[in-house]
């Protein structure tokens, strides 16, 4: 079939040519198959919106690890899962489903709802906006320090704002190095959520 004159395919295999980016919005049971289909057929980056993996227990964590393994085996990187998408004002790209005010702030947020709140406040109270946004969720593959490195070298981003609930195991030193290096180039603001016991429980869903 078609949508607005553009062809639709049931899979990347059916499409017949690779894509730079895939948005993966399927139920949890179909997620691994979707990642495999994309990775095997040359997709460079997948944005996994689907939740219910590492934040939901051992079985979810196992599936999450397998998705990352399959993706990386074929040279594909994965944003998320359990994420709210990405936004790039310079590229004219908005994969969040929300209207984001443009400006020169790079926002890296583990929580989608916190990201939405910051967009609203920036537009309505500070009269500013964003150059880049990523809601990175579980950071199963691409960790927060990698987003920081990108934004640190991005001439369109004058300030980096990070909302962080937790780091991927083993990535603490990388985070410190990246944040410290970025702070030598531009202001870096970090808001740490999930400090209390109740906050940690709420933060585990990244919503």
Give the label of every model feature segment.
Residues 1-207:
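Catalytic-core regions of core metabolic enzymes
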